[in-house]
Regions:
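A glycine-rich, often tryptophan-bearing local segment used as a flexible ligand/cofactor-contacting loop or short
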Residues: 521-601
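Polysaccharide-binding and catalytic clefts of secreted carbohydrate-active enzymes
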Residues: 70-331, 348, 440
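Short helix-loop-beta junction
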Residues: 469-492
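Extracellular ligand-binding/catalytic regions of CAZymes and related secreted enzymes
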Residues: 221-224, 231-234, 412-444, 566-571, ...
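Short, Gly/Ser/Thr-enriched beta-strand-loop segments that form substrate-interacting elements
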Residues: 605-620
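Hydrophobic targeting/anchoring helices
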Residues: 28, 45, 62-66, 197-198, ...
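Catalytic domains of carbohydrate-active enzymes, especially glycoside hydrolases
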Residues: 10-53, 196-213, 392-402, 482, ...
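The substrate-binding groove and active-site-proximal loops of carbohydrate-active enzymes
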Residues: 6-13, 30-36, 171-191, 275-293, ...
Length: 720
């Protein structure tokens, strides 16, 4: 790497550790110092000549006001576990399954009208006259009911401990007041917050950037009473924690119909992001989004009036913000900050329409990491953690620009880890070099353009619902992560986009997920027009790549609606007496690299024998291709992220786009990758592995052969 560079780095400062803060600010090339949850900045740090980010969580840290206005706390619907009646009455203790420090029953008149009791055996609501709430005991008693039927109660609760603070508190064994969260849906809360932020800006003249962490509503995170199942429900994309009787009343007024508890709790399944949303949920999301923009803009305008920038953290209480909604720019944010473990999260940040894109690296400077494993404590290896996260992120940074990087947490924890400090210095310099390359021009991409088709489309570009470790069970997150660092143009589309003609911009459409999921598409595949348009598009030369149960929907002659294009289908039990086409697997195009591993699915069968099976395992298809007109259908029964499988995906996409023979700017060693920036004539080569690697790259200036140390990056000029 070349001479030392500075800037584009946000350092978490810490009062009481001024010398360390200022020393690392210089070493890591920081231009900004921030505070974090649990830390402050002293005058010495504030006056040291750096930009200052100040973190505000707009809906918490207001305990005095919250205590005086406890009916303005944020809320949620909860549903009890189903109980079987053994006689004609049943008593259900509402809070039996839930963490008492997180929730308090809201039995106010406004909330109570939204409570529901259901007979889950019949699926019918129990009439109001058959149940009664006993406030003192916290029980709902149901009478005159059918023995041996199952019953649930859906009720409203106040959330009395803000979830991110609750997590940080329990993780770090803090002993301080539990922070509550207030709901800006109430006019009184809005007045209080507008006055509060005005006052805050007056008192923090040194702050250059107000870091909103985040806006109003947290993703749903319901904790249980039993440590054997502490996290009952967690969904990063869920709107469950935006609910209140006032929001529901205002919704009914605006949309002309009322939502019920059942619209949210869905018999205990909730309305998870992984299932296609019904129109009622989409209406409610739009309603909340409208409100969050309308009130959020007022707060941001005040920040701007005080000549400060407003950045927002794209995590935690981000719900209702929707950066991939066409209206996001109405907020007026100057910057977006995303915490990242993975490449797809860096791409999620870089694609947002905002002036400054910043990623917060991991590990976070806490003793333990998100999974509860030691980080900055005995048994931890923060340097190795940082390397693993950096190699995930680096490949994505080569494809699309990010403007800034940074860290968060307790800076003093890094003192016993000089190798960690050295490594952050190295990657900060690396990042600044990559950033400069993007300024000069875009990196080379292959010609084949890819679209990912699912029920959410653009709104959930790159992500599914949270971090990789929260969504690893879905094939698509593995595909997104693989794509995040490949030299391919990627967009995310939904079924309406197909109707509007988006296929004209695509060479390959990937549909990956289990039947009924938002990622496969579920009921959207009943739209014959979309099936027709996709079929015609493949016939004219496009490629449909299906993974797991693509286009799956019961009720038709085939389980996969695109079976005629794929040349295969899945037997769900109705073809048990039918004969099967035999096959011989031949990978004539050499698509499958050594070490690639695709887990097969039972009951996948060829429809008419015309599809070519390229790879199989134990007699089950693991990769197939089917010519259809000028195009093709390609099938993979699963996809799991690995270096080998990432190269397999790249090969399959190049094959789909008839680019297999063009190997320009693709490394011959799959443990390495490269990016070429034509305007700068700069080639960046990265080693993703923990071993020394030798790699050769075809360029327009001849072959380049390099040796790379474990995890290393080489940046070199080629050509003139």
């Amino acid at each position: 790497l070349s001479k030392k560079t500075t800037g584009a780095f946000t350092l978490p400062g810490e009062s009481g550790y001024e010398a360390l803060t200022l020393e690392l600010a210089e070493r890591w090339g920081a231009d900004v110092i921030r505070d974090s949850d649990g830390t402050q900045l002293s005058d010495e740090i504030i006056n040291a000549g750096y930009g200052i980010y100040s973190t505000i969580c707009i809906i918490r840290d207001h305990n005095e006001w919250a205590s005086q206005n406890s009916d303005k706390l944020q809320q949620s619907f909860l549903i009890t576990n189903p109980k079987v009646a053994v006689q004609d009455y049943l008593s259900i203790y509402l809070m039996e399954d839930f963490f008492a420090e997180q929730f308090r029953v809201n039995d106010s008149k406004e909330a109570f009208k939204y409570w529901q009791v259901f007979d889950r055996t019949t699926g019918e609501e129990v009439p109001r006259e058959l149940w009664n709430y006993e406030r003192e005991s916290g029980n709902v008693v149901i009478t005159g009911i059918a023995p041996w039927h199952k019953y649930t109660v859906s009720f409203m609760v106040y959330r009395i401990w803000e979830e991110i603070s609750m997590y940080n508190h329990t993780t770090n064994h803090w002993e301080k007041e539990h922070l509550m969260q207030i709901d800006p849906i109430y006019v009184e809360t809005q007045k209080y917050l507008l006055h509060w932020i005005e006052d805050w800006c007056h008192k923090h003249k040194e702050t250059t950037v107000v870091r909103f962490t985040s806006l109003f509503y947290n993703f749903a995170w319901i904790w249980g009473s039993d440590e054997r199942n502490r996290h009952l429900f967690s969904d990063w994309g869920s709107y469950d924690f935006t609910v209140s009787s006032r929001a529901l009343d205002l919704f009914a007024k605006k949309y002309g119909y009322s939502l019920t508890a059942e619209d949210f709790v869905n018999g205990g399944k909730y309305r998870v992001s992984h299932i296609p949303a019904q129109q009622r949920k989409l209406d409610y999301m739009a309603f909340i989004n409208d409100f969050v923009i309308e009130f959020g803009k007022q707060l941001i305008d005040i920040v701007h009036k005080h000549d400060k920038l407003a950045y927002v953290f794209y995590d935690d209480s981000w719900v209702g913000m929707e950066p991939y909604n066409d209206r996001f720019e109405e907020f007026g944010f100057d910057g977006m900050i995303k915490c990242v473990f993975s490449g797809y999260e860096a791409r999620l940040c870089s694609g947002v329409k905002v002036d400054t894109h910043e990623i917060r690296l991991h590990p976070y400077l806490f003793p333990v990491g998100l999974g509860g494993l030691p980080t900055f404590m005995e048994g931890g290896n923060p340097t190795l953690d940082a390397k693993k996260y950096w190699i995930n992120i680096r490949r994505a940074l080569l494809r699309e620009p990010i403007d800034r990087i940074g860290l968060g947490g307790y800076l003093h924890l890094v003192e016993p880890y000089p190798d960690f400090c050295d490594y952050i210095e190295k990657i900060a310099g690396e990042f600044r070099e990559i950033k400069e390359l993007h300024h000069k021009g875009k990196p080379y991409q292959i010609k084949t353009k890819v679209a990912i088709l699912h029920a959410w489309g653009k709104l959930r570009s790159w992500t599914l619902s949270g971090h990789f470790h929260e969504t690893y069970m879905h094939d698509l997150i593995h595909i997104n992560e693989a794509l995040s660092g490949l030299p391919i143009e990627v967009q995310f589309i939904d079924f309406e986009d197909i109707r509007q003609g988006v296929l004209q911009e695509c060479d390959v459409v990937i549909n990956a997920g289990s039947a009924g999921s938002a990622w496969s598409g579920g009921e959207y595949w009943s739209d014959h027009k979309c099936v027709d348009l996709l079929t015609a598009w493949v016939y004219e030369g496009g490629t449909f790549i299906g993974v797991n149960q693509p286009s799956a929907l019961e009720g038709y002659d085939s389980f996969f609606r695109m079976a005629h294009v794929l040349g295969l289908d899945e037997d769900t039990g109705s073809k048990v007496a039918h004969g099967r086409w035999t096959f011989e697997a031949r990978d004539e195009q050499d698509l499958v690299p050594e070490g690639a591993s695709i887990t097969p699915k039972n009951n996948i069968y060829l429809t008419d024998g015309s599809a070519a099976v390229l790879c199989e395992k134990s007699g089950m298809i693991t990769l197939s291709a089917h010519a259809f007109g000028k195009g093709k259908g390609i099938y993979l029964p699963s996809f799991t992220l690995s270096f080998e499988n990432t190269r397999l995906l790249l090969n399959v996409i190049r094959y789909a786009g008839n680019e297999l023979k063009d190997t320009k700017y693709i490394t011959d060693n799959l443990y390495t990758e490269c990016a070429y920036y034509p305007e700068s004539k700069i080639l960046v080569v990265i080693n993703n592995s923990d071993q020394l690697q030798k790699t050769t790259i075809d360029t327009e200036y001849g072959q380049q052969t390099l040796e790379l140390d474990p995890f290393d990056t080489i940046i070199r000029t080629i050509g003139d």
